[in-house]
Amino acid sequence: MRIRPAFAAPAATALALLPVLTGAPAAVAAAPSAAVAVCREGAVTVTAARSATPHVVRISVTNKGGATCVVDRVPTVTFGDLDGAAQPVPPAGSAPYRLAAGASAYAAVRTLDPAAEESRTVAYLTVSGDPSHRGTRFGAASVGTSGTIRVWEPVTTLWQPTAAKADAALAAATR
């Protein structure tokens, strides 16, 4: 017996309407598509900079390529030679995040839980837009700390369309 794809058109329509229904810009909607490739590491620029909030680093990824591509919706942020990476807040799994040509996405990373009574120190952190990338290393001075970066239970927001939304997402998730 042959199974008909009765749900194919409604599902495709729902995915197409997702940006409209959620208010998300079309360039940001993360519906998986075989036609959109993972951004090549050389086609994206990653930055990390100091935030006005203590122990928070602002990161960004920009698509320098000529076509839309995807990165993982959870930035990969590691700290020196410590095991593990910053955990996403809110908790989320891997999924594609679309970046139009020339577009940027932003995230906020809290390196140190304010309630922490202990911490580790590292000389650098590494940021990548996708776990398949090696990432870019940023020294302590480039993220606004003197000498070392204090780390304990680090968290990161998902990629956001603006730095302000990344800051708001971190504030909401870490109250």
Label for each model-derived stretch:
Residues 66-86:
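Short acidic, flexible loop segments centered on an aromatic residue
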Residues 59-66:
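Asparagine-centered strand-capping/turn motif at beta-strand->loop junctions
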Residues 58, 76, 124:
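Conserved beta-strand and immediately adjacent loop positions that scaffold enzyme active sites
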Residues 61, 71, 79, 127-129:
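Hydrophobic side chains in beta-strands
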Residues 1-55, 83-92, 105-107, 111, ...:
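Membrane engagement elements in two modes
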